[in-house]
Amino acid sequence: LDVLRAMHKSPAAVEAFRALREASGGLPAVIHASYLVNLGAEGELWEKSVASLADDLEKAALLGVEYVVVHPGSGRPERVKEGALKALRLAGVRSRPVLLVENTAGGGEKVGARFEELAWLVADTPLQVCLDTCHAYAAGYDVAEVPLGVLDALDRAVGLERVPVVHLNDSVGGLGSR
């Protein structure tokens, strides 16, 4: 279906998506923002990233999608938080869709590999978290051997009530491989 790939705003595509959602029995829908978004960037790249994320949020709202997941990007955590909140304002989002910041594997200047950093990003904001198990494993959280320990660490840092989506996937790399 076109709308799932290109997120067209045409009334026919929106109606087709909504019909598909209804046929699914009301399961929550989650979309992933563009992988090119870098909310930690500076200057023009940051502005373009915020605008792209705002556009994704607007499309998600039009479609009735509950969650939009975004990678925080590389750079300063303060810029990530500022960019995410600005995108929500630009899109006019009040409650839905909920913007979820996905944890990362880390490496370089990537933001969001540590649960404590995610906790800071979402504190005192409407932002929430999407846990990606592959990224967590690559960042050093042993989801394969001690998954309950990882969930406990996430709960202590962020609070599981702020983690409505888990992206369960495998990793070809080793524990902590980034």
Q: Where are the regions that the model predicts?
A:
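Non-cysteine beta-strand/loop elements that form the S-adenosyl-L-methionine
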Residues: 1, 27-31, 127-133, 160-172
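N-terminal pre-domain/capping segments
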Residues: 1-33, 39-55
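Active-site beta-loop-alpha junctions enriched in small/polar residues
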Residues: 1-2, 34-36, 73-75, 102-106, ...
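Acidic-enriched, low-complexity/disordered segments with a strong bias for Aspartate over Glutamate
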Residues: 2, 55-56, 124, 132, ...
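Gly/Pro-rich active-site loop or hairpin
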Residues: 8, 40, 111-119, 137-178
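Short amphipathic alpha-helices and their capping/turn segments at secondary-structure boundaries
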Residues: 10-25, 54-59, 85-89, 114-124, ...
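Short, basic/glycine-rich phosphate-binding loops at helix/coil junctions
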Residues: 29, 99, 173-177
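Active-site acidic/histidine proton-transfer and metal-coordination neighborhood
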Residues: 38-131
